[in-house]
Amino acid sequence: MPKCMERKVIMAVRHIDFEEYKNEIVNSDKLVLIDFFATWCGPCKMLSPIIEQVAAEHSDLEVVKVDVDKVPELAVSYNVMSIPTLVFIKGGNLVKQSVGFASKAEIEKMIEECR
């Protein structure tokens, strides 16, 4: 493959299930951003690269994605009724929740508000 065709992909965002949430996310010392999404959701697809970029730029922020079709019990526990929904938790407690598409600037502002 030519050098110009090579791409380094850094996966800063991981998809989690309910067990990972209970074992890792709830007890995290970091501010956690959970992106509730579905593969068929247009606004979720538009938001995904922004979430990846935010995660890559904030090493002090834990960023995870939850597919509401695969982990509905977690979506229900946060009363997620529409997607995309962004949930910020700290020390296991809900700090902020945002429903609908958000720009990078809006997400950056939410991060600062939650710190």
Spell out what each predicted region is.
Residues 72, 78-87:
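Structural micro-motif
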